[in-house]
Amino acid sequence: MYQGHMQLVNEQQESRPLLSPSIDDFLCETKSEAIAKPVTSNTAVLTTGLDLLDLSEPVSQPQTKAKKSEPSSKSSSLKKKADGSDLISADAEQRAQALRGPETSSLDLDIQTQLEKWDDVKFHGDRTSKGHLMAERKSCSSRTGSKELLWSAEHRSQPELSTGKSALNSESASELELVAPAQARLTKEHRWGSALLSRNHSLEEEFERAKAAVESDTEFWDKMQAEWEEMARRNWISENQEAQNQVTVSASEKGYYFHTENPFKDWPGAFEEGLKRLKEGDLPVTILFMEAAILQDPGDAEAWQFLGITQAENENEQAAIVALQRCLELQPNNLKALMALAVSYTNTSHQQDACEALKNWIKQNPKYKYLVKNKKGSPGLTRRMSKSPVDSSVLEGVKELYLEAAHQNGDMIDPDLQTGLGVLFHLSGEFNRAIDAFNAALTVRPEDYSLWNRLGATLANGDRSEEAVEAYTRALEIQPGFIRSRYNLGISCINLGAYREAVSNFLTALSLQRKSRNQQQVPHPAISGNIWAALRIALSLMDQPELFQAANLGDLDVLLRAFNLDP
């Protein structure tokens, strides 16, 4: 169990390569040796037993016996009376079973292969004395629509033929008695099948007629198009005619959910107060002040920038992406927002978009934009929010731009350029080179806690969890309220088997989020679901069912008391 969970968390950090591993990715990953827990909305990660369910359909026993009898019948001649009877009985049973129940395609193909071996084999009996019997057998075969496993005279010796004729002559009545019930059942199944096919055919015809009628109604579609265009035009006019003091909402802003009961929405100097709280490490309150600043001035690109960066540090990546996108709509050359957006895209596995943001960073940078102009015919990136793996040629093209820019700088180190290089090496899985790039940036900015966190995440993804703990610890020394780094530290503790320390870090992060919001008397505190999910995993590894139940219920006070932490 220990090994399974260790591999689980390692896979998670690889799937979220830069700032932090998303708990959602390894909520779907399970191991067979884990202990099954009660199924709730919050414990999907622990219900591991369901992943091992074999959904393949078993082969029915009668068909298995029938299939086994076929090869043996091929090798033996019709020497005894019972042989002929058994052959027909098994064949009739096989055909009836094939029509009665649904089987897998592989099973159907397997039976078809056995029958096709004898497709060209015919039984030519004595047409004078036994003609009526052969006519009856051929009639039965044609009515049922299946192939009889009959033996060719060319494949048997003369004594065998005489013996076979004698057996068929004496047992003709029993053969027909056995074939008749099977024939009746097969005929009934054919009627049902024909009725079903006829019904499906009529439904298909009805659907095609309805589809053709709708497609041919061009007047209807032209009217719908005209109404849609008119509605869009009216909305555009009404938005432009709004009063100047009213807050307009763009498409990006609609994707961002502001706190409805923000006590600072009318606070004078909300942006400056937000910067002050950010330096103090009070991330939840910083977010409230930045939202207030934006509500007062929706066109404040810098407020959107800091809102996005703070949301990322507060372990809320989706809100960060929306805020940073809005910032870049207002200010396309905002280099800090572009780099932060590239990091957030990387964390959410949007590799194509991360490459595009990094390329735009070069294009918008006055020091390096000439490099893009010199690269004629470089592949463009037009896909938005795509989680498919980045094209290797595109990634190599952007990486080449950054390496060329670094070469142009000579001995001078540009920390922002090195940060971009670190992200690119991360995307390509070159963790050691990414570590070198982040270390180079830290030589210029040793007090940049976000760089220390990125270095820690890179070390962790490079299977160097002990060094990652040191990097995360350094980031928290500089910024104690850095919730994302606290979360990452907990993940690395799980990797190292230090489950109690992991729980302590997760609880500290949750407590920081709640404490900050409670001090401002803001209802419904926003606490990261990722942290709660990681906490449940750590508690399950500690084999603490009572505490695990408290985590399921979101009872933070019980958990804090259990681990002797201040509420």
Curated annotation (Swiss-Prot):
* Keywords, ordered alphabetically: Cytoplasm, Membrane, Phosphoprotein, Repeat, TPR repeat
Cross-referenced SUPFAM superfamilies, in alphabetical order? TPR-like
**One Pfam family here:** TPR_16
Query: Does the record carry Zinc as a key word?
Result: no
SMART domains, per the entry: TPR
Q: Where in the cell is it found?
A: Cytoplasm; Membrane
User: Which residues get modified to Phosphoserine?
Assistant: 146, 194, 198, 202, 386, 388
Q: Which InterPro entries match?
A: PEX5/PEX5L, TPR-like_helical_dom_sf, TPR_rpt
> Where do the TPR repeats lie?
267-300, 301-334, 336-368, 415-448, 450-482, 484-516
Ranges for the region named Disordered are 56-105, 150-169
UniProt topology in membrane? Peripheral membrane protein
The family assignment reads: Belongs to the peroxisomal targeting signal receptor family.
What PANTHER family is this protein classified in? Answer: PEROXISOMAL TARGETING SIGNAL 1 RECEPTOR PEX5, PEX5-RELATED PROTEIN
Q: How does it assemble?
A: Interacts with RAB8B. Forms an obligate 4:4 complex with HCN2. Interacts with HCN3. Interacts with HCN4 with a 4:4 HCN4:PEX5L stoichiometry; reduces the effects of cAMP on the voltage-dependence and rate of activation of HCN4.
Protein name, as recorded: PEX5-related protein
**What organism does the UniProt record list as the source?**
Mus musculus (Mouse)
Q: Which gene encodes it?
A: Pex5l
